[in-house]
């Protein structure tokens, strides 16, 4: 075994606070398993605007107590430099989440911080709300959201103004992530960090207030029949309380998926967007003749929905379709403030805002950018993230979105209308906006960089048989957006394609938008483009 690697591993073992991961590494050293050790020691798990996200395992390249402890120490150092002194910590029900929560609490307490801990595994929006309600400087959520079961992660929120940014209890953006990453890198030894045991386990006050505010989004009780799945996550308890308090008592749960289970046994990936993920919910909807299906992802910050389409039967609404439903409804009923969506989301929201005379702002991908819009009345990203009440949660919130959608569906039903009718009205006014996302998994992120750089140096003249009109390099934007890695490609026929690397997984994401007169024309065009585009990008 390489001597330098062996010494690095031994040094890490000596500093590891978790006997289980220390033993796992010791056994690998004793077996001389250099290949596995190199995988676990391929660099410290990268901290960015999404915080931490990675597989649970030993060593600096995985999620474990040693990595989490060093990260907490780095965040504490960042806080001290800015006179911050309070933190609230939440967690989901994934493997390791409770251990990582209390590892963080010990380090923060040892650093002299005032530490609050949510009383049990709860949705991410509750943590975001608690950060604001408690006026904490920092909020930390231990979760990997909708990642595979072997992963865990760490989201960071900032309460006040910091680094010249009015965070208002939202997730970090540049340059804050870089400052924190530098402070994490400066932590040479975890064992040298003082530990404490002074913290407050919160009661139900913050949870109850969140439930009260969310239920107020649906002031008109209804007996609309809704099937709900939590995707084996932590959403069920909180969502049911919100619906009950709002007077929506005809909620039918998918029992196989509504108890927290870190193995996510009924789905290949615990993401409502993944094919097959809500099959059990759709089956239940057919069985009980439901009016609507609602799904949260495991940490309940995202919301998906399915409707009984009069043409094709039960189907998932695309993220953009749900965004357009929310946008049109809020524009009709409360045409105030600023609306926004991300650059990869449908352009239809901009047109809705123009129609109703509402301010609109486009931002980079990631809800952390939408949360920085002043006076945000509604914001969404196509990856089923929605903000319908930014005064309560300045982040995407799958539970408030769920109850608000239920109210919209109920109000429409009282007029003999459906969500499909609402969408058709928008499409009749602005044209049918067909959108689709293609994801291409890669062995490593460097292959995406090579592809994007190749397109920049040698732009194609045509893609999928259609002439390329122009290419916008998002790394050098012309429209006032901050730079980001990706390309926006315009083809003949006002076809928009955006290509960018995923922020959390080893895959490339491609977003297509076509505008046609009808759904059928849109689907035909997407079908023609999809295959050649995947081949071009692979």
Where do the language-model regions lie?
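Short acidic, glycine/serine/threonine-rich loops at helix termini
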Residues: 98-103, 128-132, 150-156, 192-195, ...
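An N-terminal, well-structured beta->alpha segment
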Residues: 4-104, 110-111, 200-224, 234
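Phosphate-binding and adjacent anionic-ligand microenvironments
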Residues: 286, 290-292, 315, 333-501, ...
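Gly/Ser/Thr-enriched, mixed-charge loops and adjacent short helices
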Residues: 12-16, 20, 36-40, 45, ...
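Short beta-alpha connecting loops at secondary-structure transitions
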Residues: 154-172, 197-199, 262-269, 305-315, ...
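N-terminal small/polar loop signature for handling phosphorylated ligands or for N-terminal nucleophile
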Residues: 88-151, 242-305
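Conserved phosphate/anionic-ligand binding catalytic regions in large, soluble enzymes, centered on
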Residues: 41-61, 145-147, 230-238, 242, ...
